[in-house]
């Protein structure tokens, strides 16, 4: 054993046992020098290095993006005072910076509505803390997208359609490998992302008030129809939306045979509804499969509605907020911002505006009174694009000189903004001509059959959606298909406007029908 310990350490080289002597200091120094040289070489920027963002000609990613932006025509400024009688919703002066059509996403909870919007627009609509924690949409989400078509005749459909964010240049290069063409902007769409949860039905109805068309999401891995699928379809039927595209989502989780069977159940479900004959597009929103086909159907099957730019402008408020950071200096404070969709007319920078009903209070006798808010428009925005004027379509942020405390946390939601002195009357009670659904939608009873809708009864409390206003209403009197409702809070509306009616069933508001306003008691605003 001791003899073995005394032996010099050795290794086998070419079959011979060779002794291992002391390490050669010179060789080690050479190795260290060689490693140092290799490290230094690695630190030198190569022709294309991912972490520095350098391209072969020394151009950074940011510089490349700027160059492509300029080559694609950039994003031209809007003219200050254009002739609105000569403009239409697809005019370059408008469509380059602002969406001109509102498309809603509707369907049952967790069927992929927000994911589809993100796949098309690249914008995450789920933003709030509560929404991110639960992974559901709670408030209405908004995202704008530009849809382009390649002008190269050899570029095949639907590959030639591509969507980008709303700040994209007007004529980018085609992204299909080997295609020399450039894209042309054909649509600028604003998506209204509605919540699918049953308890958020009133939020969905507020969103339906501004929709021009809808994408109905139906998940392929669940039976059709789910409760809110039918409830949302009834809601857009009430709003008389004629243009619907059905997206059969999550096809990546199914076999071909089951996808075809599921499609048959969709066709059976939509028979006789407003969506009868609508295209059914199989997609995977997560994998962005068939999204180019969705873009093609949006362009080909959903026309941009005609807009009248010459009449008095009106906007319904769907969001409002205070943009000031806590602790901001007094001279840096900005006025409140109202976000909403313009129904008709054109708003311009500097316009005098009126917000109705405004500040609602009660006098000494407990009688409701309204004080409209007057202000000026100081800024107009469509997402990140600043505007000189704004037309109907898309969500517009209107910067005002209004006290920001009146706007924070959606306090202006349901109000109507318009030119001073040109807004409709404020009503405290209304007389309606109503129509009830035959069966209750979105509720599964014990026998899996839908319950019948009861007739309206005096003194019962309903929820009515007038535009983006959701307010309580007590039934004062009922006769045949006419009823008189006393509103909990006053609403700025017009005769012959369509409203949605909901009743509280099992602690949730459920859609039971719709109505048309025939007349009502107006409230004179205080000066």
Swiss-Prot record:
<dbReference type="GO" id="GO:1990856">
    <property type="term" value="F:methionyl-initiator methionine tRNA binding"/>
</dbReference>
<dbReference type="InterPro" id="IPR027417">
    <property type="entry name" value="P-loop_NTPase"/>
</dbReference>
<keyword id="KW-0396">Initiation factor</keyword>
<feature type="binding site">
    <location>
        <begin position="110"/>
        <end position="115"/>
    </location>
    <ligand>
        <name>GTP</name>
    </ligand>
</feature>
<dbReference type="Pfam" id="PF03144">
    <property type="entry name" value="GTP_EFTU_D2"/>
</dbReference>
<keyword id="KW-0547">Nucleotide-binding</keyword>
<dbReference type="GO" id="GO:0003924">
    <property type="term" value="F:GTPase activity"/>
</dbReference>
<feature type="region of interest" description="G3">
    <location>
        <begin position="193"/>
        <end position="196"/>
    </location>
</feature>
<feature type="modified residue" description="Phosphothreonine">
    <location>
        <position position="60"/>
    </location>
</feature>
<comment type="similarity">
    <text>Belongs to the TRAFAC class translation factor GTPase superfamily. Classic translation factor GTPase family. EIF2G subfamily.</text>
</comment>
<dbReference type="InterPro" id="IPR015256">
    <property type="entry name" value="eIF2g_C"/>
</dbReference>
<keyword id="KW-0342">GTP-binding</keyword>
<dbReference type="GO" id="GO:0016282">
    <property type="term" value="C:eukaryotic 43S preinitiation complex"/>
</dbReference>
<dbReference type="GO" id="GO:0043614">
    <property type="term" value="C:multi-eIF complex"/>
</dbReference>
<dbReference type="GO" id="GO:0045903">
    <property type="term" value="P:positive regulation of translational fidelity"/>
</dbReference>
<dbReference type="InterPro" id="IPR050543">
    <property type="entry name" value="eIF2G"/>
</dbReference>
<dbReference type="GO" id="GO:0003743">
    <property type="term" value="F:translation initiation factor activity"/>
</dbReference>
<dbReference type="InterPro" id="IPR044128">
    <property type="entry name" value="eIF2g_GTP-bd"/>
</dbReference>
<dbReference type="InterPro" id="IPR004161">
    <property type="entry name" value="EFTu-like_2"/>
</dbReference>
<dbReference type="InterPro" id="IPR009000">
    <property type="entry name" value="Transl_B-barrel_sf"/>
</dbReference>
<comment type="subunit">
    <text>Eukaryotic translation initiation factor 2 eIF2 is a heterotrimeric complex composed of an alpha, a beta and a gamma subunit. The factors eIF-1, eIF-1A, eIF-2, eIF-3, TIF5/eIF-5 and methionyl-tRNAi form a multifactor complex (MFC) that may bind to the 40S ribosome. Interacts (via C-terminus) with CDC123; the interaction is direct. Interacts with GCD1. Interacts with the eIF2B complex subunits GCD6 and GCD7. Interacts with methionyl-initiator methionine tRNA.</text>
</comment>
<feature type="domain" description="tr-type G">
    <location>
        <begin position="98"/>
        <end position="307"/>
    </location>
</feature>
<dbReference type="InterPro" id="IPR044127">
    <property type="entry name" value="eIF2g_dom_2"/>
</dbReference>
<feature type="region of interest" description="G4">
    <location>
        <begin position="249"/>
        <end position="252"/>
    </location>
</feature>
<dbReference type="InterPro" id="IPR009001">
    <property type="entry name" value="Transl_elong_EF1A/Init_IF2_C"/>
</dbReference>
<comment type="function">
    <text>As a subunit of eukaryotic initiation factor 2 eIF2, involved in the early steps of protein synthesis. In the presence of GTP, eIF-2 forms a ternary complex with initiator tRNA Met-tRNAi and then recruits the 40S ribosomal complex and initiation factors eIF-1, eIF-1A and eIF-3 to form the 43S pre-initiation complex (43S PIC), a step that determines the rate of protein translation. The 43S PIC binds to mRNA and scans downstream to the initiation codon, where it forms a 48S initiation complex by codon-anticodon base pairing.</text>
</comment>
<feature type="region of interest" description="Disordered">
    <location>
        <begin position="1"/>
        <end position="83"/>
    </location>
</feature>
<feature type="region of interest" description="G1">
    <location>
        <begin position="107"/>
        <end position="114"/>
    </location>
</feature>
<dbReference type="GO" id="GO:0033290">
    <property type="term" value="C:eukaryotic 48S preinitiation complex"/>
</dbReference>
<dbReference type="GO" id="GO:0005840">
    <property type="term" value="C:ribosome"/>
</dbReference>
<feature type="region of interest" description="G5">
    <location>
        <begin position="284"/>
        <end position="286"/>
    </location>
</feature>
<dbReference type="GO" id="GO:0005525">
    <property type="term" value="F:GTP binding"/>
</dbReference>
<keyword id="KW-0648">Protein biosynthesis</keyword>
<dbReference type="GO" id="GO:0006413">
    <property type="term" value="P:translational initiation"/>
</dbReference>
<keyword id="KW-0963">Cytoplasm</keyword>
<dbReference type="Pfam" id="PF00009">
    <property type="entry name" value="GTP_EFTU"/>
</dbReference>
<keyword id="KW-0378">Hydrolase</keyword>
<feature type="binding site">
    <location>
        <begin position="249"/>
        <end position="252"/>
    </location>
    <ligand>
        <name>GTP</name>
    </ligand>
</feature>
<dbReference type="InterPro" id="IPR000795">
    <property type="entry name" value="T_Tr_GTP-bd_dom"/>
</dbReference>
<dbReference type="GO" id="GO:0001731">
    <property type="term" value="P:formation of translation preinitiation complex"/>
</dbReference>
<feature type="region of interest" description="Interacts with CDC123">
    <location>
        <begin position="515"/>
        <end position="527"/>
    </location>
</feature>
<dbReference type="GO" id="GO:0005850">
    <property type="term" value="C:eukaryotic translation initiation factor 2 complex"/>
</dbReference>
